[in-house]
Design a protein with these regions (language model features):
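C-terminal and inter-domain tail/linker signature
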Residues: 1-142
Length: 142
């Protein structure tokens, strides 16, 4: 996968355009993110459309990208900002404005249609910052 194509995926993801999953994921894609695993385009859409984006703005940045014919790897920084107070999210109870910062490495297996067939997320850190500015490393959140 060319870096320009990958960065277009990130742009669409940051715009919360879940049709990007139709264009970039293999129908039987498998994702492992910490202890959370799900399959397929519908699994990815459910995760983000129903569990993440209603509660958080999520912005990805990719300072490093490498690829060959069958895989890509990136360094990823992600900032989640709670949209509103919510008692029950994937990250637990949150208050509007609290943030969660992910730093890690993600490996993508790419099929012959130039779509992601497997996504493996590895955490370096996951940090919660409360409204008083207190930061706490959470390890793997789910």
């Amino acid at each position: 996968m060319l870096e320009t194509r990958f960065r277009e995926y990130i742009r669409r993801f940051n715009a919360e355009d879940d049709t990007a999953f139709d264009d970039y994921l293999a129908p039987d894609m498998h994702m492992k993110n910490g202890t959370l695993e799900f399959d397929g385009v519908d699994g990815m859409k459910h995760h983000y459309r129903d569990l993440i984006w209603p509660h958080f703005t999520e912005r990805l940045s990719v300072p490093r990208f490498v690829s060959d014919d069958g895989r890509a790897a990136i360094q990823m920084h992600t900032l989640f900002t709670a949209r509103r107070d919510a008692p029950d999210t994937l990250f637990g109870a949150v208050r509007a404005g609290e943030t969660f910062e992910f730093d890690g490495v993600i490996m993508y297996e790419i099929d012959d249609t130039d779509r992601f067939s497997d996504i493996l997320v590895a955490y370096n850190s996951f940090v919660h910052t409360d409204l008083d500015g207190n930061r706490r490393d959470l390890g793997i959140p789910h």
